């Protein structure tokens, strides 16, 4: 169980945040914060191979990118990514191994606890002086980024990968 947790929760959170918010976002930063946030988020969404998961991953990627821009670190996003993966892991584990009543109770607790905990964290961070604002820097036209050969190559690769391995 521990090895599954490492493989399905910890490693993806660390590796994906290093790649998307660390490397890709860092490479895109000279083009401005908007490109640095949205371009890796789109790739992050495509990586998840499924339309529903991809859209959710894109939105989460935008938030994690914004958080990395505002905080100057990928560690908060890495922690949130780990929490998200852990919640999904626990939900799947409980649905498979726990009685329905117990599974439902734990899922309901997690569904209520983590958003409330997140709101408390935001309130606490604001009390410590952390301000949440867009903070986007001007840069090159975002269209230039999305039509660049390197970006197009990665998008084509992820789409082909999704078509081959999903079907």
Model-derived segments and spans:
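Transmembrane helix-loop-helix hairpins at the membrane interface
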Residues: 2-166
């Amino acid at each position: 169980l521990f090895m599954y947790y490492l493989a399905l929760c910890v490693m993806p959170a660390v590796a994906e945040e290093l790649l998307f918010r660390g490397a890709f976002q860092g490479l895109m930063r000279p083009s401005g914060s908007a490109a640095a946030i949205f371009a890796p988020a789109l790739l992050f969404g495509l990586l998840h191979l499924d339309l529903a998961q991809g859209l959710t991953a894109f939105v989460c990627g935008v938030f994690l990118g914004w958080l990395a821009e505002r905080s100057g670190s990928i560690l908060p996003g890495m922690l949130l990514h780990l929490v998200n993966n852990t919640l999904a892991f626990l939900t799947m584990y409980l649905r498979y191994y726990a009685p329905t009543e117990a599974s439902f109770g734990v899922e309901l607790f997690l569904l209520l606890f983590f958003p409330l905990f997140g709101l408390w964290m935001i309130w606490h961070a604001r009390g410590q002086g952390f301000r949440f604002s867009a903070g986007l820097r001007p840069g090159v036209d975002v269209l230039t980024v999305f039509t660049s050969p390197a970006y197009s190559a990665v998008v084509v690769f992820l789409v082909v990968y999704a078509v081959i391995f999903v079907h």
